[in-house]
Amino acid sequence: MTRFDENARSPWTPLHDVKTVELFPLNQRLDGSITLPGSKSLTNRALIISALANSDSMLTGMLKSDDTYWCIQALKRLGVQINVQGETTSIRGIGGQWKSSSLYIGAAGTLARFLLGALAISRSGNWEIEASQSMSKRPIEPLVGVLRELGATIHYLRREGFYPLSIHGNGLAGGTVRLSGQMSSQYISGLLIAAPYADTPVTITVQGSIVQHAYVFLTLHLMKSFGAQVEYDQQLQTIVVHPTPYTCQDIDLEADASTACYFLALAALTKGRIRLNNLTASTTQPDLHMLTVFEKMGCTVTRGSSFIELEGVSQLKGGFQISMNEMSDQALTLAAIAPFADGPITITDVEHIRYHESDRIAVICEALTRLGIQVDEFEDGLTVYPGTPKPTLHPLSTYDDHRVAMSLSLIGTKVKGLRLNDPGCVAKTCPSYFQLLEQLGIQVHYQ
């Protein structure tokens, strides 16, 4: 059993005392609708940009999760006034005039990449930043390197290239830097969010391809909505950000498309029907490209003006290979439902997910193998063969990884007796995940 980092769990984690969950197959056809929580990606971007602005911004539909909790707590320690009232969050930005402080960022990858540049724009101040055990194993050097080129003073406190670290406020001079997005697009977004506060324009020359490049567009669109002046080509080879401070805004945040995919997969897997009440296909969140994957597997998808609906089929179709590079957070979702297809499914171009909260390729291969499913693991993906998963004697480990937990839970809606350790890890992005499953008729036992 893999121990989780309890310090990274926030008060917004609802399953603090729950060690395992057991899921049970549906007794009847799934036919329901849900309202999804807000987007984690948009929430943390909007919180930090609002804090960088001067005066009051309002966010509606903010996600309340571990990652957003640590973002809010860090911003408060920096002197930002934030008030969360139900679905509405007000932020009084201070233009980057941060208080010196020691900060803890939990396991929040977005916060780890976005906050660093925001601190670097300050003309004075000192900060030490600690991260969770898992986040401290994920490299930050690509972003630190370009921030140093632009004038930032950053020192690693233990291991070179990883959290924890300290930063001294020098401001950013501006200029041209080269940055790769092949490991994570968040390095690029982290620099972009800070760039309007540099002394001169910041030009980013992107080296190679960008994994999940749509998230960079998401960052750019949000920056522009807060008044940033940005120029870029559609291939994102060169991005220029001009010195223009953000202006306060009132923003309605979309629902989380990544979370949506688990519920769409649930309907696909159980020959059910589900309607997502607060998400449309017009979203720029890349994970919703999974809709075309579900259609490829035989499902019927309705893209409404205010909803998305999916209806499953009695036999999912397999027998294909697919690059999941642009929606790599859903590689595990597809792997989890792949055993129930009528042919093998090969997932490629996701080597970078080996460096997330867990080595996701290795972990999902291990779990499926334990369940009796044949898998072939390779450097940038895996092939999953059809089969009937069989419950294991001991609970499956979730490896303190929310995407592992949510993906494996789908199998539990088809196979009796599947148990998962540490279900509370879902609070990183969707604290209410298991409650939403129960709302849809899935029986969940908490132990």
Curated annotation (Swiss-Prot):
Keyword flag Membrane: no
Superkingdom as given in the UniProt entry: Bacteria
Compartments, as annotated in UniProt: Cytoplasm
Protein's UniProt keywords contain Transferase: yes
Active site: D329 (proton acceptor)
Keyword set, alphabetical order: Amino-acid biosynthesis, Aromatic amino acid biosynthesis, Cytoplasm, Transferase
Name this polypeptide is given: 3-phosphoshikimate 1-carboxyvinyltransferase 2
